[in-house]
Amino acid sequence: MATTTTESITTADRRRRGGAATGLQAGRRDGRRKPRVDPLFLAFLLPTLVLFTLAITLPAVMGIVLSFTNSVGFGEFRFTALTNYIAVFSDPAILQAYLFTLGFSLVTVIVVNAIAFLLAIALTSKIRGKIALRAVFVLPMVISGIVIAYVFSFLFANSLPAFATAIGFGPLEQSILANPDLAWLAIVVVTAWQAIPSTLLIYIAGVLSIPGEVYEAAALDGASAWRQLVSITAPLTAGYILINLVIGFKNFLNSYDIIVGLTDGGPGTSTTSVAMSIFKGFNGGDYAYQMANATIFFVIAVVIAVIQLRATRGKAAL
């Protein structure tokens, strides 16, 4: 009887093992099986992909190809190898535009993120009327950049000099837009004024995502407001900071409308950005030359973005 029972247990155990092995093999087969793509997903994706290819990818590729030619935008052309690229790197005006654009973008992204981060902390604290204040601070988002530029241009050219004259402040008695050494500061101020609201909204979302219990525990441990900012708020919003830095720097590299409305690249060429030089070059008939300039600018922007992401990889996560 004992022998029969033992054989039954052994047989059942083998069956269980065989079933497990069969299931494992089936799982392995399922694991090797390629995932099926939902046809509905493809149906929604395909139109967007086609439009993106026709509107973005194809023109970009054609522009890169034409940058190696002497094309004027129409008619016949011939390939000129690296002639346009050599001309771009040897053009002092283009190099000046790159230096201005990079310097302006760096200063502006620091100013915008510093102010927006501090405002986000203030507007998520226990103060009265913070909802109304948030609405006020995001108003510049709905105003066109060129309109903002024209309004500030009037202020810098008329109101500010008049006020400086009234109080006897000599350095601002003349319009700073006419000063080659100070005009860039006006562009930074106006660009920051328009860019802070969108950056602020992202920071508010980041600060509100931090559980209140974390601050309560820190307060019980005797952490000061500064210590909570440095040890809790900043680290836990690092992902949002990264997003704002990358997106902001990219947007400032492409600045155009505010610069046109304020200085139109002047005085002289002291505030001419790369985007402005490319646009003016197209209007002047330097089609292939500015295509080379645009290609170089695109590569620089991508390299900067990759460096930013790699430098912060593993340190920030939403």
Language model features: what each stretch is:
Residues 37-318:
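A structural signal for multi-pass alpha-helical bundles of membrane permease subunits
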Residues 1-45, 128-130, 309-318:
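Transmembrane alpha-helical segments of polytopic membrane transport and secretion proteins
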